[in-house]
A protein has these predicted regions:
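Beta-sheet repeat architectures centered on beta-propellers
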Residues: 247-249, 260-269, 279-289, 300
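Juxtadomain low-complexity/linker regions and immediately adjacent membrane-anchoring helices
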Residues: 1-77, 94, 101-117, 123-125, ...
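Beta-sandwich interaction modules
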Residues: 85-89, 130-168, 239-241, 246, ...
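Acidic/polar, low-complexity linker and loop regions
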Residues: 55-73, 81-85, 125-142, 219, ...
Length: 358
């Protein structure tokens, strides 16, 4: 069994959440499959994006309203539980955040996390569960950060959170590495930056209003809240940036910068660079970054597409198409950097290409 460490928030960010993906989040497609009880508050709240909130004095027919999962008192079983299907095909797991915000006197005294791999939800009844995080104490109204010393050996499709014996948990985050399912043909174009391909944002300048990991999730979202948005800059020459480690080294054929829902706060312009840095994540000012998309203006609520110079046409869904530099045609890259000038919001960042090797 892997050793488990209790980390501070800063250490968890540095070691876990900045390097791995929350593979159960609702915005990624995580889904509650079943639960033992949700008398006071729904289990679905566990995987919602954003920090939990409190509305003092708000009641439902079941009792006080809580932004989390809360079960009834006096559970006759050892633990209450909830089963969650990952938002990716499968993933290995490295750590978890358990947030008991606003649950004080009714919080979960202890938790554990288990995982299983099944081909279909109907196989869960006979599934074999493996321990990921052992039974660990929790305190009231606080964020708890637990990390393994290594990724699990096997990937999982579903996880089971237990609370002993009952109570409330506001949010549940589970970090790991998606197990990408790549096409056998290396010439097949895929989104190398997509979270399901293993893409992850490893560094950024700012994420004041919206998190950088939103750039890599499926779909075009629903509002400005599920994109990346930085605070307003006041200094001349200011830019914001994000570095994405691609899920696999590859050749860049097409880039998309989507400003969906950003109407008065989209970037004035953008650039895209790429680099081959297989041994370490590069610094944003590394001199080896190569220009892939030259500085171009962006517009509100648009899909901006940039394609190889020798490509016949781009995506039919694109609102605006440019050409990428030919330097991207035959070079292998491991990371891409999106720079927004001077600041603003972007919904999605796609880096389509071909893997360099199997």
């Amino acid at each position: 069994m892997s050793a488990i460490s209790v980390l501070s928030h800063d250490d968890f960010v540095a070691q876990i959440s900045s390097k791995y993906t929350d593979v159960i989040g609702a915005k990624l497609g995580g889904k509650i499959i079943s639960f033992s009880d949700e008398w006071f508050a729904e289990a679905n709240n566990l995987i919602q994006p954003g920090l939990p909130i409190r509305q003092v004095g708000k009641f439902t027919p079941a009792g006080a309203w809580y932004d989390g999962w809360e079960t009834r008192r006096h559970n006759p079983e050892p633990a209450d539980w909830v089963i969650i299907k990952l938002g990716v095909a499968s993933a290995t797991i490295i750590g978890t955040e358990i947030d008991t915000a606003f649950f004080n006197g009714n919080h979960a005294p202890a938790i554990s996390v288990e995982g299983t791999f099944v081909a279909d939800d109907k196989d869960l009844d006979s599934a074999k569960w493996e321990e990921i995080i052992p039974k660990t104490e929790c305190g009231p109204s606080q964020r708890h950060f637990f990390a393994r010393d290594a990724l699990t050996e096997a990937p999982y499709t579903h996880v089971r959170l237990k609370q002993y014996p009952d109570g409330g948990i506001a949010r549940f985050r589970l970090y790991g590495k998606p197990t990408a399912v790549f096409p056998a043909d290396l010439n097949t174009e895929i989104d190398l930056a997509h979270v399901s391909s293993g893409g992850i944002a490893v560094a950024f300048s700012d994420q004041h209003f919206g998190a950088v990991d939103n750039l890599l999730i499926p779909g075009r979202g629903k509002d400005m809240g599920d994109g990346w948005e930085t605070k307003r800059s006041r200094e001349p020459g200011h830019v914001d940036w994000v570095i994405v480690k691609l899920g696999a080294p590859g050749y860049v054929d097409r880039v998309i910068v989507d400003t969906a829902n950003f109407m008065g706060n989209y970037p004035q312009s953008i650039t895209v660079h790429a680099i081959n840095s297989p041994d370490a994540d590069p610094a944003h000012d590394d001199p080896n970054w190569k220009l892939v998309v030259d500085r171009t203006k962006t517009g509100p609520h648009k899909i901006h597409e940039y394609i190889r110079a020798d490509a016949a046409s781009g995506s039919p869904d694109a609102d605006e198409t440019q050409k990428v530099l030919t330097s991207a045609n035959d070079e292998v890259f491991t990371h891409a950097k999106l720079t927004i000038i001077p600041d603003g919001g972007v919904k999605r960042f796609r880096v389509f290409g071909r893997r360099a090797s199997a």
